[in-house]
UniProtKB/Swiss-Prot annotation:
Organism name: Arabidopsis thaliana (Mouse-ear cress)
InterPro entries found in the cross-reference section: Oxoglu/Fe-dep_dioxygenase_dom, P4HA-like, Pro_4_hyd_alph, Pro_4_hyd_alph_FE2OG_OXY, ShKT_dom
Lumenal side of membrane: 25-316
Protein name (Swiss-Prot/TrEMBL): Probable prolyl 4-hydroxylase 7
Domain of life assignment: Eukaryota
Length: 316
């Protein structure tokens, strides 16, 4: 099957997983005696996936936006902020031509990146993100922690790429998850200027003028916002244009997880040199898995395996 057709089919399947009849609406559990015969059973908070679909609201189809209330606990939010404090640097943007990270007045926040699986809390949140989005952990970039002080913002932008260099690292960012780590007294809303139903959202004086330019979501500690940057046919979605409105009162902390079409982890490691991509590689190699399971462990020149370093298939 042509890879583009397969990708488009996969995306169509992914985007139809949260089957919801109208916006906004809640994920519901349908009984098995539905008239049309379609049976959709959503698990509750006791789910082994570690997330509760009953807390998810579909906000929009154009772009595809979902809000998860209480995705993070207060302890998780506070832990992320603690990890970031003292390590923040001025936020950068990707140059549209070269793909290099450059400073810009478009983005005035400060931030830092956590390491993947940095500790148990980070690992648990990464697993929960994969369960909610139905996208593999390895497709995600490291989480970025952002801090916005009074007046700081991120003007409307796209999360998909315009340069070839970034596309080589797992392809486009298919989805973005914004996690709010703090409450904001006023401002700091996430705004979607291109949302077709923006006129239906009534806003009082508690919203900033920036937020009134589109459909907007107020930051609330623990909530998470998932939106897709690509259409189901794998083309870029201009409706996903979004920004972070200036903070007017207080401060804003958030965490961002960008998720790619393909494995970001493998593409990044391939560029970085000879590396293992699983913590158990050395143990597996000693057990003879390099010979027993060469496809996974070693791979080929075109499709590298996950344990090339331990299998001595490359030199660091």
């Amino acid at each position: 099957m042509d890879s583009r057709i397969f990708l488009a089919f996969s995306l169509c399947f992914l985007f139809t997983l949260p089957l919801i009849s109208s916006a906004p609406n809640r994920f519901l559990t349908r009984s098995s005696n539905t008239r049309d015969g379609s049976v959709i059973k959503m698990k509750t908070s006791a789910s082994s996936f570690g997330f509760d679909p009953t807390r998810v609201t579909q906000l929009s189809w154009t772009p595809r936006v979902f809000l998860y209330e209480g995705f993070l606990s207060d302890e998780e939010c506070d832990h992320f902020i603690k990890l970031a404090k003292g390590k923040l640097e001025k936020s950068m943007v990707a140059d549209n031509d070269s793909g290099e990270s450059v400073e810009s007045e478009v983005r005035t926040s400060s931030g830092m990146f956590l390491s993947k699986r940095q500790d148990d809390i980070v690992s648990n949140v990464e697993a929960k993100l994969a369960a909610w989005t139905f996208l593999p952990e390895e497709n995600g970039e490291s989480m970025q922690i952002l801090h916005y002080e009074n007046g700081q913002k991120y003007e409307p932008h796209f999360d998909y790429f315009h340069d070839q260099a970034n596309l080589e690292l797992g392809g486009h960012r298919i989805a973005t998850v914004l996690m709010y780590l703090s409450n904001v007294e006023k401002g700091g809303e996430t705004v979607f200027p291109m949302w077709k139903g923006k006129a239906t959202q009534l806003k009082d004086d508690s919203w900033t003028e920036c937020a009134k330019q589109g459909y907007a979501v107020k930051p609330r500690k623990g909530d998470a916002l998932l939106f897709f940057n690509l259409h189901p046919n794998a083309t870029t979605d201009s409706n996903s244009l979004h920004g972070s409105c200036p903070v007017v009162e207080g401060e804003k902390w958030s965490a961002t997880r960008w998720i790619h079409v393909k494995s970001f982890e493998r593409a990044f490691n391939k560029q970085s040199g000879c590396m293992d991509e699983n913590v158990s590689c050395e143990k597996w190699a000693k057990a003879g898995e390099c010979q027993k399971n060469p496809t996974y462990m070693v791979g080929s020149d075109k499709d590298h395996g996950y344990c090339r370093k331990s299998c001595k298939a490359c030199s660091s």
